[in-house]
Curated annotation (Swiss-Prot):
Key word Cell cycle present: yes
Associated pathway: Cell wall biogenesis; peptidoglycan biosynthesis
Protein species of origin: Aromatoleum aromaticum (strain DSM 19018 / LMG 30748 / EbN1) (Azoarcus sp. (strain EbN1))
Residues annotated for phosphoenolpyruvate binding in this entry: K22, N23
EC number: 2.5.1.7
Binding residue positions for UDP-N-acetyl-alpha-D-glucosamine: R92, R121, P122, V123, D124, Q125, D304, I326
Protein name in UniProt: UDP-N-acetylglucosamine 1-carboxyvinyltransferase
Keyword Ligase: no
Length: 416
């Protein structure tokens, strides 16, 4: 199993290009199930999660062709509307085939999902919404089985803000009979990107980006070409890496448009951040000032950046309080950061981080995707060598990580 070896103490400098957003690409790939016509997507990142989903779609009968960052999907013949456990167990986003399959085929059988082990992320909101639209849904032997002749528009209220739930129900509603209204909808930019693609395919959607989304169903959707938005979490991760090392970098093919909460905190920490057209510059001070963090749904501070900010607070001046309000059990990286010398105390959903002068290299273990990123950042700052085990988590969400870090001057390589 591969590991990542980092020789710390190097100030990051230079330029790197940001990839397309994994969390936008995954639902948009699933949206291709809604039409018999080809859908072409560009700026698709080359990641393990993307490969897993493309393999799953292929098993269902979708013809997939890929040329680097361009993917064309032809779902004219779906002959197997099933997502088996073997394909689903490593990736929670596979639940996103449920809505499109039910809407298009009238039936779906999808294994309950896996993915990062960061607490309970139930699919009950997906099921409740499909039931309100007329589907008969059962959960047996680890599978969600949904059947309907045609979905009917309905007024849906999610008990909690759920990104994948909003996406699943929005896709399902595109082919429903009548109007569907999703209240308490997720407002994330990735939801908007999905809506933009669906509209290009002929869907009638309004309100994406607000907490009330309206979808008027149509009889059929068309093919389309769509460019996946830049990955705001990858962008934030590299900004944090530069900030932690006292570096100065320029990130291209990205924007601060969806990163206000992250950029504000980096500036509070002492960084200069300049937005250019399709690029961001960051210049960090010699040592950061600690910043308090509270995660909340978009447009507030994203939970997917919590671990990275724990890493930069670990070497900042002062003490910081980090509150995680989205997921339970999302402080598993704290123990690994402590192995590097970080001073962190956990009390329920709150972490108190007292910045230290320096971290020391050690062997640490990644526990989930964003936790892996925090360990990379800490390893870049630490004195000596840091070895990160179980980096398959990183391969799920960061395209060409070693190559991009090396372009910024980091001493990092993959080892067996």
């Amino acid at each position: 199993m591969d590991k990542l070896l980092i020789e710390g103490g190097v100030r990051l400098a230079g330029e790197a290009a940001i990839s397309g957003a994994k969390n936008a690409a995954l639902p948009i790939l699933c949206a291709a199930l809604l039409t018999r016509e080809p859908v072409t997507l560009t700026n698709v990142p080359q990641l393990n999660d993307i490969d897993t989903l493309l393999n799953l779609l292929g098993q269902m009968g979708v013809k997939v062709s890929r040329d680097n960052a361009a993917v064309t999907l032809d779902a004219s013949a779906i002959d197997n509307p099933v997502a088996p456990y073997e394909m689903v167990k490593t990736m929670r986003a596979s639940i996103l085939v449920l809505g499109p399959l039910v809407a298009r085929c009238g039936e779906a059988r999808v294994s309950l999902p896996g993915g990062c082990a960061i607490g309970a992320r139930p699919v009950d909101q997906h099921i409740k919404g499909l039931q309100a639209m007329g589907a008969q849904v059962t959960v047996e032997h680890g599978y969600v089985h949904a059947v309907v002749s045609r979905l009917a528009g309905a007024r849906l209220f999610t008990d909690m803000v759920t990104v994948t739930g909003t996406e699943n129900l929005m896709m399902a509603a595109c082919l429903a009979d009548g109007e569907t209204v999703i209240e308490n909808a997720a407002r994330e930019p990735e939801v908007v990107d999905l809506a933009n693609c669906l509209v290009a395919m002929g869907a009638r959607i309004s309100g994406a980006g607000t907490d009330v989304i309206r979808i008027r169903g149509v009889d059929r959707l068309n093919g389309a070409t769509h460019r996946i938005m830049p990955d705001r979490i990858e962008t934030g991760t590299y900004l944090c890496a530069a900030a932690a090392t006292g570096g100065e970098i320029r990130l291209t093919r990205t924007s601060t448009a969806y990163l206000d909460a992250v950029v504000d905190k980096l500036m509070d920490a002492g960084c200069d951040v300049v937005t250019e057209r399709d690029a961001i510059r960051l210049k960090a001070p010699a040592r950061l000032t600690s910043v308090n963090i509270r995660t909340s749904p978009y447009p507030a501070f994203p939970t997917d950046m919590q671990a990275q900010f724990m890493a930069i607070n670990a070497v900042a001046s002062g003490a910081a309080m980090i509150r995680e309000t989205i997921f339970e059990n999302r402080f598993m990286h704290a123990v690994e950061l402590q192995r590097l010398g970080a001073d962190i105390r956990i009390d329920g959903n709150t972490a108190v981080v007292q910045g230290v002068e320096r971290l020391q290299g050690a062997t640490v273990m990644a526990t989930d995707l964003r936790a892996s990123a925090s360990l990379v950042i800490a390893g870049l700052v630490a004195e000596g060598e840091t070895v990160i085990e179980r980096i398959y988590h990183l391969d799920r969400g960061y395209e060409r990580l070693e190559e991009k870090l090396a372009a910024l001057g980091a001493h990092v390589r993959r080892i067996a």
